[in-house]
Amino acid sequence: MKKVNDISKSKTLYVVVIIFLMAALVITVITAVSLGQVNIKVSDTYKIIFGKLTHHDEIFNSSSKAMIAIVWNMRLPRVLLSLLAGAGLALCGCVMQATVNNPISEPYILGVSSGATFGATLLIVMGLGAFVSGGAFVGAVIATVMVLGIASGHGKMTTTRLILAGTVVNALFTAFSNFIISVGANADSIMTIKFWTMGSLANAGWKSIILPAVVVIAVTLFFCTQYRILNTMMLGDETAVTLGINLSLYRKVYMTLIAVVTGVLVSSCGIIGFVGLIIPHISRAFAGTNHKRLVPVVILLGAIFLIWADVLARVLVKNAELPIGIFTALVGAPFFIYIVTKKNYGRE
């Protein structure tokens, strides 16, 4: 009876956590849209968003056209993109850590970041700044295909081969990018590349969030159904074999989906590090290791985290904007040091 009561309490606590995070996300979105170089009352922000969504323009008739443009056309798309990016990167990090059975893995292990950087760098140096997102996505896809090809060649894909392949491809594309910068980049190009590689949501708009929204939502729904396989992956290949599960096949499918999500997000936002590393760890403190519970918490917490990181990037310096990657690194780097030193990862 005591065990049944404990399970019931655990379920109740989990429901409370989910409700709290959902409420926190809604409050975060409204507050983030209100904050910026020009602060807007939360009540006005709510009226504008609610009026636009319900097509009741009379609700926000008292607001100026400039205020409406700031809220609806500039800030809301940006906040929604940061929500999608945070949720997507955190989800990919969670799945990656289960897939390779390594708690300090993140999506960029597939070479996505270095491939995207190469594609973006090439187009920036060539003066084709309008096509940077497309170039970054193509570069990310090429790098991922190389990693998966190397890791699965001449036998089944293993976690060790995947990590080694990712390391090699990352080094290769980083060398290509550095060569292009050294040979053909001017001062303006270098600044653009530097800002892009540290992440930015400055170019967010309604049209630019359509693809990330479709991809992130679709992949999220898929992985919400894959908790049994993800839990099995955490137990290791030998356990999976006894259960009759082909982990090599699932790894290929999961890695491909992770690469697609990460590639789309990187092409839209640049390189934003540590989200896929730290959010799954923090989420496990609330949801445990069962991915049926873990995945929803990861998605909500990742979205909230990146929205606030973007708020800091927008408001911390007056009349200027900082790369969002600075703030994710300031939180992520100390946390990474903590989990390596305190959790004894990598020790025999």
Predicted regions: what is each one?
Residues 1-348:
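Alpha-helical transmembrane segments in inner-membrane proteins
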